[in-house]
Structure formats: C-alpha cells, structure tokens
Amino acid sequence: MTNWKHFLDEEQDRFLSELIEFVKIPSVSASPDYIDDVKDAADWVAKRIIKAGGENVEVMQTGGHPCVYGDWLHAGSEKPTILIYGHFDVQPADPYDLWDTPPFDPVIRDEKVFGRGASDDKGGMLIPIISFEAIKETTGKLPVNVKFLFEGQEEIGSPELPDFIAKHRRKFSCDMIFSSDGLQWTEDEANLVTSLKGLVGAEIRVTGPTTDQHSGLHGGAIANPLMAISQLVASMKDEKGKITINGFYDDVLELTEEDRADIARVPYNEAEYIKELDVTELHGEEGYSTRERLCLLYTSDAADDTPCVDLGGRRII
C-alpha cells in the first residue's frame, strides 16, 4: 500500500487545484452581498470532507452563516477524539486597487497561491482534511477518532457559534480541539500554539452637526468630531505605550519569569520581523521584549470603522 507521504506527493497537483477552486468562492462573511457565496463555500467543504472519507457530514444552520460538521469515529471508544476546527469565510478584499491580481481569481507566483483566503483560512483548513484523507487512504484507518467543525463567520467574531455549540454539545464533545487557523513560525520551523489572547471590543461613536458644515465658516465655533475622536483614541495610551484606560489593569496577571524564559527560547529575528512588516521601528510598552508584548502582554488598539473620505477639495466638519 502507498505510503501516506508518497500519496501526498502524488496528489499534490490535485490538492493545489482544489485550493484554487476553493479560493475562487468569495465567501465574505461581513457583507450581506455574499451570503450565497458563504453557503456555496460551506457546500464545497462538506463535499470535500465526504471525498476525503468523512462520515455524517452535514451543513448545519446557526441563525447566521452555516457551519460544516463531519466525523470518523472508528478508532475505538478507548481512543481519544480530536475535533479539528477552521473557517471558510474570508475578510473583504477591498481596496481592490492594491491587489496585483484579482483577489478571487487566484494565481500561483513564486510558489505561493495569491488570493483572498488562500492562507486565512482556506489553505489552513484544507491541510487537516488532506492529511485525514492521506492517512485513511493509505492505511485504511486512523489512530484517533476525528471530528470536523468548520464555520463561516469567524471573520465577524463568530457571533452565533457559542450558542450553536452549546445546543449541539454532545455532537461536538471531544478530548482535544486542534485549530487549523494559524501561522507557521517560519518557512522552515513549525509551531504548536497552546493558547490565544482573548478579545474585548467596544464601539465608540462621536456625533456632531446633523448636516455638513464648512470649516471656513464654522471652524472654531463648533467641535470637530474627527478631532474629538482622535484625541480620545490618543488618550488611551501614554507616550511609553502604557494603557491609560481606567481599570484596564485590574486583575491582570503579570508575566512570570517562567513565561519570559519560555518566550526567550523561541527563535526570533527582530530585524527580519521589522523587514517583514515594512516598518522602520517597533513600539510598545516599556519593560517588555517585542515577543513578550506579542505573545502574552495585554494590549489596546483602535480599529478604524469610518467610511472612505473624499479629499477632493471638501472642507467639512
């Protein structure tokens, strides 16, 4: 029987074609214009799990974008059950003029697939499906029981997922969850992430005049909402990067020496990191290394949710 490694090599062209086909589906979860496309992506995933040898495959409704479930539970009750998670929705692709090629017409360049979602997370979630297929196809079995759960709303914060999982907790019961949504440390070094930062979000709305007011006529007499929100956001951190939001640090655990030692053992090239981000310098709270700030330190950031601004001569408050 063919070795699973040989199987992967022999089927490489097929897997690549499948990824390109998958990326062509514009499954943007943030826009109602793409609801049907997200459903199409869910159907594609369900068919791919079946093709790989998965069983009990179904597209499940959540009240929002759907989830896809599948399993293979023949390793035996004494063997652990691993649930593999991923997502098939993608971020919006605009601004389109910054793309060298159409985001949903993927191309291969420099041995990489360029297209929206190729890495986050369509390529990532295909890997465990392909691995499952390779082992099952070449050995006829797996050493563990496997469940798949792929969702279509991760990029908007998975709003329906908690209640959905609670409702179907027996179906999703497992001994371990493996997330396919992540990054490899470097091209030559793999990594196993054991925890992730949590997230708390708040929306800030600043209102001003109900109609456009000319800055030349009314500037200096009324408050400018853009200036106000800029001042508000800037006040969230001091010049040393420390967060100034009242109560932010309450009950926050400090990094231990063991935490710092664990992070320090991980290979890291700061010059390469700066080059990769195309910035001139790094910034953050004093007293911590870049890796400590990235991996374990609490942060506060502002995410822009304002509409595009036409700067063609308009002077509006």
Tell where the protein language model's regions lie, with residue ranges.
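Acidic/histidine-rich catalytic neighborhood of metal-dependent amide-processing enzymes
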Residues: S119-S195
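Conserved small/polar residues in nucleotide/adenosyl-binding loops
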Residues: Y298-D305
